[in-house]
Design a protein with these regions (language model features):
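Alpha/beta-hydrolase active-site loop
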Residues: 54-73
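Active-site nucleophile loop of the alpha/beta-hydrolase fold
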Residues: 107-116
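Conserved alpha/beta-hydrolase
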Residues: 18-20, 25-50
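Catalytic active-site module of serine/aspartate enzymes centered on a nucleophile-bearing elbow/loop
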Residues: 217-268
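Short alpha-helix in the alpha/beta-hydrolase fold that links the catalytic acid
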Residues: 194-204
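Short beta-strand/loop motif that positions the catalytic acidic residue
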Residues: 178, 184-186, 190
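Active-site glycine-rich loops that stabilize anionic/oxyanionic intermediates
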Residues: 13-16
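Gly/Ala-rich beta-loop-alpha elbow adjacent to hydrolase catalytic centers
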Residues: 84-89, 93
Length: 268
């Protein structure tokens, strides 16, 4: 694929700032890869929080990701860029790959669409959140205040999230499918992104030939580690090992030079 080891750009989950992923970035660096966490609007130290006067959308977050991917490419030409999207970050990663110059590869962890029909028992809590709680609170306050799920959340982004929960309509164009190599990781017992919802996410947005699935089972969790939807990133060695192995296998079957910027990556 290339003589350069990749750089991993971590796109945080909803309500989590980049500082949470220091252990994850460190685990990649210990394996000889570069890695850094991208900022999450509204959740960085010293940055503006969502409010009636501070608003943004999925497309704004996607554009932030596009700027970060371009910057990573310019730093070391020819180095593969992999986006690792965690939860909400996975949705943004898919939107980026479909609507901007794509990264060379995508990894999602606990990534699913919040469409209630993709969840067990009809996803009633998600349906309630999307149809009632988000519209009412954003209408009253001009944003989604804490302690509501994802709060403080930007009005436009959370309303887009809510519409997706109710109707399944994506907050970005999705006529095509992601064709860059993609590793979709499910977390055993994850109630926020159960395996069935992760699989539906893959079917809706990713070309089948591009996707590799992995379920991080309870039995595979080392002592002192976790495969919880959030806490896996504090003890990320099993996830990082899986990603490195997956990408190494991709490199073994991809012609030298890899995919050019803006072109779909190789099938997996």
């Amino acid at each position: 694929m290339t003589r350069h080891q990749p750089i991993v750009l971590v796109s945080p989950a909803m309500g989590i700032g980049s500082r949470y992923y220091q252990s994850l970035a460190g685990a990649f660096k210990a394996r000889g890869w570069a890695a850094r966490a991208l900022t999450r609007r509204g959740f960085e130290l010293g940055a503006p929080r969502a409010s009636r006067g501070q608003d943004w959308s999925y497309d704004d977050e996607i554009e932030d990701m596009a700027v970060a991917v371009a910057a990573a490419r310019s730093e070391v030409p020819g180095r593969p860029v992999i986006i690792l999207g965690h939860s909400l970050g996975a949705q943004i990663a898919a939107g980026h790959q479909l609507n901007r110059v794509p990264a060379d590869g995508v990894v999602t962890v606990g990534g699913a669409l919040p469409y209630h029909r993709d969840y067990p028992w009809g996803g009633l809590p998600i349906l309630l959140m999307g149809s009632v709680i988000v519209p009412v609170l954003t209408g009253v306050f001009g944003y989604l205040p804490a302690p509501a799920f994802g709060g403080p959340g930007a009005r436009t982004l959370m309303r887009e999230w809510g519409r997706m929960a109710v109707t399944g309509k994506m907050p970005f164009p999705a006529a095509a499918r992601v064709r860059s190599p993609s590793l979709l990781i499910s977390l055993d017992g994850d109630r926020l992104a159960p395996e069935i919802a992760v699989e539906a996410f893959g079917k809706r947005l990713f070309a089948p030939e591009s996707v590799t699935h992995w379920l991080y089972r309870h039995a595979d969790v080392p002592d002192g580690a976790s495969n919880h939807h959030i806490y896996w990133a504090r003890s990320p060695a099993p996830v990082v090992d899986r990603i490195v192995g997956w990408w190494t296998a991709q490199a073994a079957v991809t012609p030298a030079g890899g995919a050019a910027a803006g072109e779909p990556g190789p099938a997996s």
